[in-house]
């Protein structure tokens, strides 16, 4: 049984993320979506919110499991005896960072491969940062996120504006 890890902050989970999950889940027996507790990035959604959102969107995939992790990715990968780390590459701008991370992961985890997947054409330009910025300015992000995520964004932005 081959287990893969797809790590990220998923702040918020977009249709691009789901596209990668859908495709990667067909390649592996088990895919664990690792929602990073990235305090350094100062996420818009709390870890608990990101876990809930991810489970809402991805819960229908029978071989996909969502859970949080903190600390080094290598420890999370080892804990699950995963053989592959899945990463998405949207553009050339992603490549340098992802290439460096893959090299470091290979050094730390010599028996684990990093698999890069490019998004489907309609999702190549989507990022959580762009989605949050558009939503915060009152723009329509419904083509980039699932309805439940759109609702979460609107509620969180409204609460911040009131608070």
Swiss-Prot record:
<dbReference type="InterPro" id="IPR014729">
    <property type="entry name" value="Rossmann-like_a/b/a_fold"/>
</dbReference>
<protein>
    <recommendedName>
        <fullName>Phosphopantetheine adenylyltransferase</fullName>
        <ecNumber>2.7.7.3</ecNumber>
    </recommendedName>
</protein>
<feature type="binding site">
    <location>
        <position position="87"/>
    </location>
    <ligand>
        <name>substrate</name>
    </ligand>
</feature>
<feature type="binding site">
    <location>
        <position position="73"/>
    </location>
    <ligand>
        <name>substrate</name>
    </ligand>
</feature>
<keyword id="KW-0460">Magnesium</keyword>
<keyword id="KW-0173">Coenzyme A biosynthesis</keyword>
<keyword id="KW-0547">Nucleotide-binding</keyword>
<feature type="binding site">
    <location>
        <begin position="123"/>
        <end position="129"/>
    </location>
    <ligand>
        <name>ATP</name>
    </ligand>
</feature>
<dbReference type="InterPro" id="IPR001980">
    <property type="entry name" value="PPAT"/>
</dbReference>
<feature type="site" description="Transition state stabilizer">
    <location>
        <position position="17"/>
    </location>
</feature>
<comment type="similarity">
    <text>Belongs to the bacterial CoaD family.</text>
</comment>
<keyword id="KW-0548">Nucleotidyltransferase</keyword>
<feature type="binding site">
    <location>
        <position position="17"/>
    </location>
    <ligand>
        <name>ATP</name>
    </ligand>
</feature>
<feature type="binding site">
    <location>
        <position position="98"/>
    </location>
    <ligand>
        <name>ATP</name>
    </ligand>
</feature>
<dbReference type="GO" id="GO:0015937">
    <property type="term" value="P:coenzyme A biosynthetic process"/>
</dbReference>
<dbReference type="InterPro" id="IPR004821">
    <property type="entry name" value="Cyt_trans-like"/>
</dbReference>
<keyword id="KW-0963">Cytoplasm</keyword>
<keyword id="KW-0808">Transferase</keyword>
<comment type="function">
    <text>Reversibly transfers an adenylyl group from ATP to 4'-phosphopantetheine, yielding dephospho-CoA (dPCoA) and pyrophosphate.</text>
</comment>
<dbReference type="GO" id="GO:0005737">
    <property type="term" value="C:cytoplasm"/>
</dbReference>
<dbReference type="GO" id="GO:0005524">
    <property type="term" value="F:ATP binding"/>
</dbReference>
<feature type="binding site">
    <location>
        <begin position="9"/>
        <end position="10"/>
    </location>
    <ligand>
        <name>ATP</name>
    </ligand>
</feature>
<dbReference type="GO" id="GO:0004595">
    <property type="term" value="F:pantetheine-phosphate adenylyltransferase activity"/>
</dbReference>
<feature type="binding site">
    <location>
        <position position="9"/>
    </location>
    <ligand>
        <name>substrate</name>
    </ligand>
</feature>
<dbReference type="Pfam" id="PF01467">
    <property type="entry name" value="CTP_transf_like"/>
</dbReference>
<feature type="binding site">
    <location>
        <begin position="88"/>
        <end position="90"/>
    </location>
    <ligand>
        <name>ATP</name>
    </ligand>
</feature>
<feature type="binding site">
    <location>
        <position position="41"/>
    </location>
    <ligand>
        <name>substrate</name>
    </ligand>
</feature>
<keyword id="KW-0067">ATP-binding</keyword>
<comment type="pathway">
    <text>Cofactor biosynthesis; coenzyme A biosynthesis; CoA from (R)-pantothenate: step 4/5.</text>
</comment>
<comment type="subunit">
    <text>Homohexamer.</text>
</comment>
């Amino acid at each position: 049984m081959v287990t893969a890890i797809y790590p990220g902050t998923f702040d918020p989970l977009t249709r691009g993320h789901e596209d990668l999950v859908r495709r990667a889940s067909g390649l592996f027996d088990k895919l664990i979506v690792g929602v990073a507790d990235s305090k350094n990035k100062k996420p818009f959604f709390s870890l608990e919110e990101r876990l809930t959102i991810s489970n809402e969107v991805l819960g229908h995939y029978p071989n996909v499991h969502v859970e949080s992790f903190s600390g080094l990715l290598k420890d999370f990968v080892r804990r699950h005896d995963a053989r592959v780390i899945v990463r998405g590459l949207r553009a050339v701008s992603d490549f340098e960072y992802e290439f460096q991370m893959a090299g470091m992961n290979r050094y730390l985890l010599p028996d684990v491969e990093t698999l890069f997947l490019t998004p489907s054409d309609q999702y190549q330009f989507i990022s959580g940062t762009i989605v949050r910025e558009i939503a915060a300015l009152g723009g329509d992000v419904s083509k980039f996120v699932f309805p439940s995520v759109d609702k979460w964004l609107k509620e969180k932005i409204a609460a911040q504006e009131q608070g």
